[in-house]
Amino acid sequence: MITKKIFFILLFAITSILSQTYFPDYGNWKRKKPNQVGFNQKKLNKAIQYAIDSESSGSRNLTEFIKATLTKEPHGEIIGPTKDRGDMTGLIIKNGFIVSEWGDINRVDMTFSISKTYLSTVIGVALDKGLIQNVNDKVQIYVPTEHFESEHNSKITWDHLLRQTSHWKGTLWDKPDWADRPPKNVAWTELQNQPMHEPGKNWKYNDVRVNLLAFSGLQVWRKPLPQVLKENIMDPIGASNTWRWHGYE
């Protein structure tokens, strides 16, 4: 009898918690006033104004902006689509409820490095589904291409690529690893001879190596990574269908 009572109380508690949990319907997010979810309206307004006033001073024409940013980088050609950015836009959500918004929240804008989140997620799903057995496995086991044939590159694991500690050496899609964010005041002819660290020993932000992770993930999945993201993440969570994840052209 005591066991039954405990079970009933526990079940009642779980049911009560679930009944209080709000999850927005597809395309129909409910709204609440800031003070209803614990925000101080004056402080929130100040934060929103700060966000609006902090707009980048760079050109809204992102083709021009990217070219200006990469002027000092060899092989800085744009090889993917761009889209002009719009007015400053934001959305504040608390507990699943929209509490504030500004600008055109339905506009689709470029988000740049958030694609790294997408990329690490689809690699994680590959691990979950057994397509990758262990993040500490050598990538060469799964991707037997020239990209991982050298003595140095053959040591690289999935973990190294995910953490940007691989120090992979090579050229991918006509862009050599040394050309991304090169050190200042170093002649281009000297960049190719920069010291190389053992995989896993040193962190370095490098988009060529991030793209190598995308290439490697593509070899494992054997289908477009945006499709993988859509089927395994975006559709199940009820995301809109207006997002795009473009590869290189």
Report the location of each language-model feature.
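Active-site helix/loop module of the DD-peptidase/beta-lactamase fold
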Residues: 129-168, 192, 221-249
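Active-site SXXK
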Residues: 40, 96, 110-135, 161, ...
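N-terminal secretory signal peptides that target proteins for export/translocation
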Residues: 1-3
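Sec-dependent N-terminal signal peptides
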Residues: 5-15
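Extended ligand-binding groove/face enriched in aromatic
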Residues: 78, 85-86, 92, 138-142, ...
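Soluble non-cytosolic domains of exported or imported proteins
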Residues: 34, 38-45, 87, 113, ...
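Catalytic-site signature segments of enzymes, centered on catalytic residues
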Residues: 99-103, 171-249
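N-terminal leader/targeting segments and the immediately adjacent pre-domain N-terminus
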Residues: 17-104, 129-132
